[in-house]
Amino acid sequence: VPAAINSYINYTKAYALFAIKVFCNATQPQTEGAMRPITIKAREGSFFNPKFPAPSGGRAILQIRIFDTINGAMSKALPKKAMGAFSHWSNPNIGGIDDKTSKPFVMYDLSLAGYGGRYGEDGPEALTPVMNCTNIPVEVHETHNPIRVKCLELLPDTGGAGQWRGGCG
């Protein structure tokens, strides 16, 4: 696609393997032998295997979408291992000119939200989706940017209803 959200095949394979591993044995070491039985293919020139120089910058967004797609498909065969969809991304990007220094600034953060519920338990709250990152503490933003955070809290009832609800964010 013309937007910077294409998933080159190396990312498509990595994200798909992650999703499949969650269903098989998430604690098994990530080795070539463990992944060898899995084949991942995508038509060349497609969204999941674009031709260079197709733009691809939104890889974090893709990871969650690919995971949710495979999770949804696998849930038909293994419903007790599946989970509800992630909250996806809503990252604030704030920028401008600092009134005190007259210098430009850009502030970026990860908005933490809930994971989907799964068989037997509610989804966890206020986590980043599946990629080993975290938000930047409020104190860091306030120290390095001309902003003031008035409130940072979990919003009740935002995780989606169900026997096992999604986590709030």
Name each model-derived stretch:
Residues 1-168:
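Glycine/proline-enriched, intrinsically flexible loops and inter-domain linkers
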